[in-house]
């Protein structure tokens, strides 16, 4: 993982991109002791090259590390958290908070030097294993999510199997009258 981080950081550096261009990382396994694994992650982080540390952001996952876990780590090492909605649905935390309140906690991990807060958005493919991404967006589900976050300033990355076509679909869902490329993703 460290070699991969070094490689990808070098690419961003060679492209002369500032530190708002980020490297997204899951924490990893728990190896029988989650708190020990968290402490190892924090220890290793402190020994990374400074340019990697400036670009690194951590994400909640759907197996081991809840949003609460990654926010704890974030607080210890002062790096941003990227929220993944599907992972949060599968492995939830903060049961008393709604989506907006949860994202306010995530937003606190982002500093001006990090750029705009980023989130991952995906939907469950109901015909596949838990955590598998959907091929297309379900319009109602997507609109409900967007309604709940409408007052937040952030970038949303879509994790949908149709990739760029899903971005066109999202524009069509959000702006049906203004968006003229609707047939591109439908064909």
Predicted regions mapped to residue ranges:
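Histidine-acidic metal/acid-base catalytic patches
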Residues: 79, 91-187
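Active-site-proximal loop/turn and secondary-structure-junction residues that shape catalytic pockets
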Residues: 27-31, 60-64, 85-89, 123-125, ...
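Active-site acidic/histidine proton-transfer and metal-coordination neighborhood
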Residues: 1-76, 80
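Conserved, mostly hydrophobic/aromatic
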Residues: 56, 84, 156
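Long, repeat-rich segments with strong aromatic
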Residues: 72-74, 81-93
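Active-site glycine- and acidic-residue-rich loops that bind
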Residues: 1-3, 58-68, 89-103, 165
